[in-house]
Amino acid sequence: NVTGGGLLKETSDNYYTAGTAEEFLNAIQSVKKSGKASVIELTADIALGDKEVNNFDSYSSFITAHKLEPLTHPTLLKTGVSMLKLADMSNLTIYSKNGAKITHTCVDITGSNNIIIRNIEFDEIWEWDDYTEGAYDRNDWDYMTIEKGSSDIWVDHCTFYKAYDGVIDVKTPVNDSNITISWCEFLPASEDNVFFDEMMNAMKANPDNYPYYKHLLEEGMTDQQIYNYAYGQKKTHLLGQSDDDSSAKN
């Protein structure tokens, strides 16, 4: 039953609260070790970039630096972007009562079942694409990827801002995957536009450092037109292995 994952009382030994990145990762580590139905309540915003988490390498069995490092965003160049792997896990709820935020990570749910992710905001895995001139084909940063036999996954009442690639990708799903995405918001740019504006302002101040941005200006676009062009999300969901793979299901 997709709604049954990790429903525990707050007094349970397997109910964890996390207000920092380290507390959250320690909770994941404990859940993986115990193998028991568990809840992780996120009580504050956490940032999971590989350059900003204390003792990051000590969690390397399930979170690593993303293989494609940031190239242009001033914040991400400092924080890095990570890949959080929820692999071979079951009966786990990750939620927040207050809509806490997770930034600078891509969540990969692999070979897992009965997972609930609820009332969490995901933000800040986008940067301007000079490398492929706006095609956004390099970084492969998605907020969430569900793949390799994962089933009974419920993503509910979450908020997702602009991502470099996709927002939620479900790769090679089968008819009985039971993957539900409900009552979620998919929004442009970033919360209050702060993270998004930082990137746009950096380009405006130093156009020579961003060849594709400079090219658009030289072709007659205004700063505001480029801002509007970059503001929206390229794509949201993908059901299948890739856009053109024969296994893609529309």
Go through each PLM region and give its residues:
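Acidic Gly/Asp/Thr-rich repetitive segments characteristic of extracellular carbohydrate-active
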Residues: 1-41
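Intrinsically disordered, low-complexity, compositionally biased regions/tails
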Residues: 8-10, 142, 244
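Short, solvent-exposed beta-strand edge segments and adjacent coil->beta transition regions
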Residues: 13, 139-141, 165
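Short beta->alpha connector loops
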Residues: 21-23, 98-102
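Extracellular beta-strand-rich solenoid/capping regions of secreted or surface-exposed proteins
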Residues: 29-36, 49-93, 101-119, 124-150, ...
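Right-handed parallel beta-helix
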Residues: 90-91, 95-98, 113-126, 150-164, ...
